[in-house]
Amino acid sequence: MEGSANQLQPLSETQVVNSEGGCVWQVTDMNRLRRFLCFGSEGGTYYIKEQKLGLENAEALIRLIEDGRGCEVIQEIKSFSQEGRTAKQEPLLFALAVCSQCADINTKQAAFKAVPEVCRIPTHLFTFIQFKKDLKESMKCGMWGRALRKAVADWYNEKGGMAVALVVTKYKQRNGWSHKDLLRLSHLKPSSEGLAIVTKYITKGWKEVHEEYKEKALSVEAEKLLKYLEAVEKVKRTKDDLEVIHLIEEHQLVREHLLTNHLKSKEVWKALLQEMPLTALLRNLGKMTANSVLEPGNSEVSLICEKLSNEKLLKKARIHPFHVLIALETYRAGHGLRGKLKWIPDKDILQALDAAFYTTFKTVEPTGKRFLLAVDVSASMNQRALGSVLNASTVAAAMCMVVTRTEKESSVVAFACDMVPFPVTTDMTLQQVLTAMNKVPAGNTDCSLPMIWAQKTDTAADVFVVFTDNETFAGQVHPAVALREYRKKMDIPAKLIVCGMTSNGFTIADPDDRGMLDMCGFDTAALDVIRNFTLDVI
């Protein structure tokens, strides 16, 4: 190819020459940190299964702090948090905890200052505190010093009284920590009348709050706050479903405020449904059908169908086609993955979910990259993907649809006896894509073939994605070598993602090449990882 880069010449300033004389994308410590913040591993593999976090997983983070770049690390933590770039929340909170325990004073100060921004809900704050406790011994440092006490106090004080009341009554405790613990240990001095009421409620209980404030002249805000706390207390004590419904409607109480017994009432569920967020609604469809909240033709079914057909609502809730597809397949099955819950799916809801699946393609933001997807079409793709209710072939078909419908330049190929084009058009349904996949005679899933095929056919691609079960057979050419050859010939700094959807672990990605990523399993968080990797965020 005329004008193509020699393999010994980097395609971009981010590439370096490796030990074999080929060019790879250098993995810097900042790149490793970003991977860790996104999915909890500094290496080139995303695992669906929860990985235990420890200092041994965060060597690049430690090196950056030791090199005097701790404040840059905090900036990365904040931007990952604010822009929602994390597939899992824990690595972000772990990294913040490490920074807050380190020896560098500037990093520590920046970490504590970032606590209210990064720990947006109490669950995050409790997790951060627990990580600090876990790290105390290995990092040989104290914990409840003045800096942490101030950070925790600021977390409460920077919110209004009503905002704190809403979150502390919804997220009461996690990881062995409660609000009462944090208020006691932080020696909080409330910054407002509203906060004084809430902190007294947490530490002393409703009875003392009621006694102290019943005769006092209060602001409108404080009155509203007391009424809300009274409603939260009332709902805990009442067995009367009508009163529960009234309190839900008047004070926007949510499921977390209710007792288990309240949730046995279908009328209570009907009240909760009115303001239920879409993500919670998708999660609870089976339960609400099983307990007869949703019955053929009733107004609740109509409400759900209406919400699922509302494009603005779907976009605002950031519902991805995958979220809907998982809800659809779970609901269609008529039973949960675990437990004894069973239901008969409502046909109108099934239709609404099916329609919402196609509607949500419009809400996916394109990356503007050229994709080449390579799909394993073997019978073993009918196994369930790790971390999902979907089988591997359904995940692959849906991903082909997502890319075809959102990216202007994309191609799909299938592993037959050789690589063959597998046209997926924007008007195809999921079933049509699956049927077409079944008609392709299956061949070996040699992960180097997509790059070899693209090089032979002069197909330009920024990102190659292989979808397979756990068959990641490497032929005569290693995928890393095929990718480097493709970069050299086409003069494109292309990337490769291999999704082994039923695999517990495999290694194809060159750990020293930032343009390669392995994925073991496939869950909804995997979508964020793919997007971040494609857009060069990680």
From Swiss-Prot:
It is found in: Cytoplasm. The modification N-acetylmethionine is found at M1. Residues 16-369 form the TROVE domain. Residues 120-284 are annotated as: RNA-binding. GO terms for cellular component: cilium; cytoplasm; cytosol; nuclear body; nucleus; ribonucleoprotein complex. Highest in brain, followed by lung, muscle, kidney and heart. Lower levels are found in testis, liver and spleen. The modification Phosphoserine is found at S4, S19. Belongs to the Ro 60 kDa family. RNA-binding protein that binds to misfolded non-coding RNAs, pre-5S rRNA, and several small cytoplasmic RNA molecules known as Y RNAs. May play roles in cilia formation and/or maintenance. This is RNA-binding protein Ro60. It comes from Mus musculus.
